[in-house]
C-alpha cells in the first residue's frame, strides 16, 4: 500500500513560526530565540514550502497570519 506522507515538520521550524506568529515580527521572533532575522525568515519559508501554503501575508513590512497560519498557531 502506497501512502502519501505528510511533510515532517521539525521542532525548530515550528518554534520559529510560533515566535513570529506571536510577535507578528521576524525581528522580534529572532531576538526571542537568539537567532538572526534571516534565520527566522528562512525557517518560515521552508515551512510554507513543506505545507504548500503561505502562513503569513507580508503587507508594508508587517506580518499578518493567513487562515492556515492561524490554524497552525492554534494547533
Give a label for each model feature:
Residues 26, 48-65:
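A short LG(V/I)-centered, amphipathic sequence patch enriched
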Residues 15, 41-42, 57:
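Base-recognition residues in the alpha-helical recognition helix of bacterial helix-turn-helix
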Residues 19-34:
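Short helix-boundary/capping micro-motifs
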Residues 1-9, 15:
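A detector for short, charged/polar N-terminal pre-domain segments
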Residues 10-13, 37, 69:
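The N-cap/first-turn positions of alpha helices
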Residues 31, 42, 49, 70:
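Alpha-helical residues within the helix-turn-helix
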Residues 36, 43-46:
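Residues within the DNA-recognition helix of helix-turn-helix
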Residues 17, 47-48:
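Conserved amphipathic alpha-helical core elements
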